[in-house]
Amino acid sequence: MLQLTTYRNLQVFLVIMTAIGMSFALFFLQRYMGFSPCPLCIFQRIGLMIMGGFALIAALFHPKSMVIRLLLWLGSLAGIGWAAIVAGRHVWLQHLPADQVPSCGPGLDYWLDTLPMQQVLKEVFAGSGECASIEWTFLGLSIPEQSLILFSILILTHLLILWRIVRPSTPKPLAR
């Protein structure tokens, strides 16, 4: 019988979710709807791509070593954990009272060209007016709220993968 929760199948699931998430963001939200991603959205995409990259390596090479599997899992978890933290911050900014929303800044490109990386991170997480605006909702949820739900599901998937790494399925002996 086919097991859906094998190590390799779970890694392929993560790769597929990355492809769907990135395609939705690029083709639907950016190209079709015409939304430009704010700095926090870009950072969420980077985290999703990091997770997808590690999951792709794990799915393609299917390492047998528990150490290699754990390292790939840790890299993948770091990527999606980063994305979830950024999405959480984004949701928080969207729920601030209007008088507490930070003003719009010059933009991520300008910051990357003129500021050291530590200052860029500080500016991005401080947020800006564009990060606090809600451009589109689906089922009453903003894009960052939907992203946070997706990232939470992917973190739960990582816990299932960890379970598969530390306790791999062993074939049951045939009954006599």
From Swiss-Prot:
Periplasmic side: 29-46, 89-145
Membrane topology: Multi-pass membrane protein
Subcellular compartments: Cell inner membrane
Any GO BP: protein folding
Cystine pairs: C38-C41, C104-C131
Annotated GO CC locations: plasma membrane
Predominant subcellular localization, coarse grouping: membrane
Cytoplasmic-side positions: 1-11, 64-70, 165-176
SUPFAM superfamilies on file: DsbB-like
Any GO MF annotation of the entry: electron transfer activity
Keyword tags: Cell inner membrane, Cell membrane, Chaperone, Disulfide bond, Electron transport, Membrane, Oxidoreductase, Redox-active center, Transmembrane, Transmembrane helix, Transport
Transmembrane segments: 12-28, 47-63, 71-88, 146-164
InterPro entries: DiS_bond_form_DsbB/BdbC, Disulphide_bond_form_DsbB, DsbB, DsbB-like_sf
Keyword Oxidoreductase: yes
Family: Belongs to the DsbB family.
Function recorded in the entry: Required for disulfide bond formation in some periplasmic proteins. Acts by oxidizing the DsbA protein.
This protein's name: Disulfide bond formation protein B
Species of the source: Psychrobacter arcticus (strain DSM 17307 / VKM B-2377 / 273-4)
Organism classification: Bacteria, Pseudomonadati, Pseudomonadota, Gammaproteobacteria, Moraxellales
Gene name tied to this protein: dsbB
